[in-house]
UniProtKB/Swiss-Prot annotation:
Taxonomic lineage: Bacteria, Pseudomonadati, Pseudomonadota, Gammaproteobacteria, Oceanospirillales
One GO BP annotation of this record: 2-oxoglutarate metabolic process
Protein name: Soluble pyridine nucleotide transhydrogenase
NCBIfam families named in the record: PRK05249.1
Catalysed reactions listed for this entry: NAD(+) + NADPH = NADH + NADP(+)
Disulphide bridges, residue numbers: none
Cofactor: FAD
Family per record: Belongs to the class-I pyridine nucleotide-disulfide oxidoreductase family.
Role of this protein: Conversion of NADPH, generated by peripheral catabolic pathways, to NADH, which can enter the respiratory chain for energy generation.
Native source species: Hahella chejuensis (strain KCTC 2396)
EC number: 1.6.1.1
This protein's record includes keyword Hydrolase: no
Cofactor note as given: Binds 1 FAD per subunit.
Gene: sthA
Gene Ontology MF: a single term: NAD(P)+ transhydrogenase (Si-specific) activity
Residues the record lists as binding FAD: 35-44
Length: 464
């Protein structure tokens, strides 16, 4: 059996694996990446971020067409099937795979296809590839295997009407009614997508409120707009059984309620991809969710074995995963770019979308920080009035004494783009992080960025 030696071996070709591999290669290291799928990109490209956001964009265009009175002269509203809309996502996936495959080739990173399993702390067996079994020796190893939907054993996911957040992309028809169990980020995003296609959606939330990690006002705005669009949200409900038949799926909840729909989508939790990695051979034990523990340098308890991305849990975002992988690699090559990823912007691609960075009002109140609030409502902005995307707001939280920007929370069209303007100021050192920047800066007009000036003036007017 052939054995190949590398400075760095990365398991997984998703965002975290790509970040780790590219950074190590650019520092002159000999790098290998092991990927068990036929194409690079990981769950992000094939099952998660890219397809779901491409779906969302297509649905948003349909909604804009159907709600714009100008287009009524053309005819009646247009409706598209889920498979038809999915075709747009498939085109984007192909483009992403092509680009990312070129990254590996251009940086001379060796790609091995197959399933990875540790033999010992430095050697990894690759099985199922074109060359049968191969062994890679890595001086340093990065585990970046990602995650998959958590699937409870008492739900039959082999039933043709019961889906999880990965298999939903294989849906071959548009259901009239849909039950979504789990009201986290993925559940809320798919609720927006399906209700935009005219599907009647029941969103079952085991918790007390939607996306409780968000600022309360933003969470409330999401709840209102989902309901306003026709989503029925049920809080504090846990499933008792999920039973599918030839005509639909019946969800029975522990409260005694029973709901029937054409299809059922499970969106409640994810599990790290650590099974079958042979971790027992090196003394690593994942937690109950299959996630690995790391220190502030992304090291596991084995000094030369690192982990990054969804496989270590929070925040389980593609953007953070790439930076985590790059930072783990920075620790390996000892460059000057290492940072432990903490203050990550959140992008939630509901319709309208949500984005935030920094602290919430509840966190600042609990910490007894003297803060003030500045608000800008999209309905008052000329650019939003022009585009018709008037739903939403920008909310700035700042220290009322030092004027330091503490939190940015945005709900509405382009929220995930808008938030980065404020993030750039929040990341400035010392007195350069100030809300007064937005008052003393000239913004293009009309733009959505102007919301920062409006919100800053609104907040400063509250200071006395």
């Amino acid at each position: 059996m052939a054995e190949y030696r590398y400075d760095v071996v990365v398991i997984g070709a998703g965002p975290a694996g790509e970040g780790a591999a590219m950074n190590a290669a650019k520092h002159g290291k000999r790098v290998a990446v092991i990927e068990d799928k036929s194409q690079v990109g990981g769950n992000c490209t094939h099952m998660g971020t890219i397809p779901s956001k491409a779906l969302r964009h297509a649905v948003k265009q349909i909604i804009q067409f159907n709600t714009n009175t100008m287009f009524r002269d053309i005819g009646e509203p247009r409706w598209f099937s889920f498979p038809r809309v999915l075709q747009n996502a498939e085109r984007v996936i192909g483009k992403q795979v092509k680009i990312r495959t070129q990254f590996y080739a251009r940086n001379r990173v060796d790609l091995y296809r197959g399933r990875a399993s540790f033999i010992d702390e430095n050697r990894i067996e690759v099985r199922g590839g074109l060359n049968g079994k191969e062994v890679l020796y890595g001086k340093q190893i990065v585990i970046a295997t990602g995650s998959r939907p958590y699937l409870p054993e008492d739900v039959d996911f082999t039933h043709r009407r019961i889906y999880n957040s990965d298999s939903i992309l294989k849906l071959s028809h548009t259901p009239r009614t849909l039950i979504i169990y789990g009201a986290g980020v993925i559940g809320c995003e798919y609720a927006s997508i399906f209700v935009g296609l005219g599907v009647k959606v029941d969103l079952i939330n085991p918790g007390e409120r939607l996306l409780s990690f968000l600022d309360g006002e933003i969470s409330d705005a999401l709840s209102y707009h989902l309901r306003d669009n026709g989503v029925l949200v049920r809080h504090n409900e846990q499933y008792d059984s999920v039973v599918g038949d030839d005509h639909g799926v019946v969800l029975t909840m522990k409260s005694g309620k029973r709901i029937r729909a054409d299809a059922f989508l499970w969106c409640n939790g994810r599990t790290g991809n650590t099974d079958n990695l042979g971790l027992e051979n090196i003394g690593l034990e994942p937690n109950a969710r299959g996630q690995l523990a790391v220190d502030n340098h992304y090291r596991t308890k084995i000094p030369h074995v690192f982990a990054a991305g969804d496989v270590i849990g929070w925040p389980s975002l593609a953007s953070a995963a790439y930076d985590q992988g790059r930072s783990a690699s920075s620790e390996i090559v000892k460059d000057d770019f290492f940072r432990f990823i903490t203050d990550v912007p959140t992008g939630i691609y509901t319709i309208p979308e949500i984005s935030s960075v920094g602290r919430t009002e509840a966190e600042l109140t609990e910490a007894k920080v003297p803060y003030e609030v500045g608000q800008a409502f999209f309905k008052d902005l000329a650019r939003a009035q022009i585009t018709g995307d008037t739903v939403g707001m920008l909310k700035l939280l700042f220290h009322r004494e030092t004027m330091e920007l503490l939190g940015i929370h945005c709900f509405g069209d382009q929220a995930s783009e808008i938030v980065h303007i404020g993030q750039a100021i929040m990341n400035q050192p010392g007195e350069l992080n100030t809300i007064e920047y937005f008052v003393n800066t000239t913004f293009n007009y009309p733009t959505m960025a102007e919301a920062y000036r409006v919100a800053a003036l609104n907040g400063l007017n509250r200071i006395f």
